[in-house]
Structures are given as structure tokens and as C-alpha cells.
Amino acid sequence: IGKQRVPLANLLTKMYADTIGEVDADVSGGVLLAGPAFLYNMLMTFSAFNSRRRGVFNQRQLLRTSSFYEMEENANGQMALSFLPHPPDYIRAHIVAAALDEIGMPNEAKQCRLLADQAVGWKVPEFITWDDVNGTKGRPTIKIPVEDIKRAAPFVARALIRTPLESLGKVSTGEVIYWTPKSEAKAQMLAEMMMDGESQLPTDKGDIHVTHVIAAASLAYWGLCKSGTQPRDGAAVIEATALKMIDQVRNTFETRK
């Protein structure tokens, strides 16, 4: 890079450090709050973004495998590399899969990887690439092997979930917010109700929180689309039932105050 030779390990560490905010949002704000539903939500969203001008069925590659970097002069007068904060979509999916493995959901993690490999297009990429954001002549394309990024993903996911943090009173994020098999069972139950057009929350299944409803909405929408329902029709059904469920959760909470 420039006149310097950078070891791959340093480059990989730098990439994860520069993108850790978005990675943590996926792990903590996605997987730990909504469980496997987040993988479907994420993959559907990325696919929609990347096909909005052509439509999903006319777009071969639904997940991005490239991004950009910046070179800026630091206080010492040297040029410093920084990766843009959003990791390419394909790698984000594999990081989410690593987080699902970490919370004990290997089957869902496998599903995430399979869907990502399908959505990425003609073939699974060998490298993820970054180009200079300004298109400056002479600056190289940075290429990091996909397999190396994947191998590092479980360590990154585990650190984000399990590392005690001073800001949280020396407990980990995974001790504050978490998704368990019990959480998933509630979300699956609600998803079945939504797909049937039912919105009355059960009173014999323990506490139901808005996170259960939100996760269920993603699962139900995915389920309807997979069964052949037109996406717009499915969205209308899920929106109506999910909003009614959220109203009930809010009313229950306000009654307890």
C-alpha cells in the first residue's frame, strides 16, 4: 500500500477495527436482540438495496463483495489507511453466522451461510476488495482472502458478545441482552400466528416483549414469501398483525407501571 508492505494479519485487524461499529450493530443490535430472524431481515434488506433498479429476479449478485478505503495524512505527516465503516454485505452475513454459532444456534448459522453463498451470485468470491474512495490514480485495490476474514469472524463475534466492558459495569453485552431458545420459541409461535392473520397475544406463554414480536414479523414475512405469497401481499398481512401485537405489548407494559 503506497510504499509500504503491510502484513495480512495487520490488514485484517485494521479492517475489523475500522468496521467494528457496524459489526457490533449486527451482532449486538441484531443477533442478540432478534436471534435468527435478523439473518433473514439483513439478507432481504441487502438484496433489495442491491437490486432496486432491476428487481431481485434480474440481479445475479444480491450481496456486495467490495467497498472503499481512504488515505489521509496523519499528525506525523504520514499517510494513514482507513476502511469505510460498512463491511461488504457478504462478509457481514458470515459474521452474523458466527454470532449465531456463538449463542448456540448452529443450524441457523449454517442457513445464514448457505443463503449468503447463494445470494452472492455466480460463485463464492475468493477475495473481498477495497478501492480508493476518491479513485486516486496509482492507489491499489486491497484484496483480503475471504477465507481469512471468515476464520477471524468467530473470534470477533465472541469478543463482542462475551468480553466484560467497563461501560457496562464489568459485564459483557451478552449478559445484558441475549437471545435464547426460549426467546426463539416465542418468536416462532408468534410468526405462525401472524402468517395465519391472528393478532391476539396468548396469555399462557409467559411474558412477550416487543423484541419477540419484531423477530416474529421477519420470520413470518420470510415464511409467507417462501410459501409463494406475493411480497407486497405478505408485507400487508404481517404489518397489520404485528402492529396489533405491539399495541398489546405496550398496553400490558403501561398497565404494570
Report residues per predicted region.
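Short helix/loop segments within enzyme catalytic domains
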Residues: 2-58
